[in-house]
């Protein structure tokens, strides 16, 4: 296996792109590429089910994607409610990208367009582009705490959305040139996937590492909050666990549970937990400073109890009224 090859990854986990790349060597008689001489086989695949004359692939992973959608929407709604919090628009943008990625993963994993169909390479390319756009949004969001630029401004959001679109298009175009043999060349194609590996795995890994290190530096040296350090550490744990579950031990899980699920099921869950820790870190580091909280949280300046009789300003009745009487008559003098 050379640099940029997907042999090891596809052998351990049934990634959607594995149907569209490889083999890298000339196939022998005992090797059976999946589609038109192209494709890499995995050691184990989870079972599919037939529902209403429709075959659904990755059943367990599909249900996790469906369950993740309301969780993401709840986080987005909560972020919208904190009007004056730093990084509110940037976090909402990241969650929007992750929501789009989840929807595309649901479409691809469930087999809405099965492998071999004309739409399949385009859907997988969109999914790959969504991954790059989401990771780019994450690393930009990680720099907000250092206040290198003013957050939430029109210029800042225009830059973020524009660069996110560029990251999406870069990976999307490279994916199409890799997946479709007639589009490719000797430098890029199903049998030469170095470019796709760099933009999809190497760049995104750098983005994630930069984000994690920046948040640790922010929590340790600037905020100096043990709970925020714990949130970053927990999010890092979930992300690392998702990669281990997705690649090294996915086929082991699949074989042990008789092909009902594989590592992608647990990797999707842990990835969602990692995103929830991103949201939690931001929620812990920001406070609502409006006089009346929009998110229906208790205001930190709100008076919880009425002033009682023991504070030196007790009420008394005058002429049947519980309010204090007027002192106007006391100030009148007889001449």
Swiss-Prot record:
GO MF, any single term: unfolded protein binding
Keyword Kinase: no
Keyword Lyase: no
Compartments it resides in: Endoplasmic reticulum membrane
Transmembrane stretches, start-end: 55-75, 92-112, 129-149, 164-184, 193-213, 220-240, 259-279
An example Gene Ontology biological process: chitin biosynthetic process
Chief location: endoplasmic reticulum
Keyword vocabulary terms for this entry: Cell wall biogenesis/degradation, Endoplasmic reticulum, Membrane, Protein transport, Transmembrane, Transmembrane helix, Transport
Recorded GO CC terms: endoplasmic reticulum membrane
InterPro entries: Chs7 (IPR022057)
Membrane topology term: Multi-pass membrane protein
Quaternary structure, from the entry: Interacts with CHS3.
Described function: Chaperone required for the export of the chitin synthase CHS3 from the endoplasmic reticulum.
Family: Belongs to the CHS7 family.
Record's protein name: Chitin synthase export chaperone
Protein species of origin: Yarrowia lipolytica (strain CLIB 122 / E 150) (Yeast)
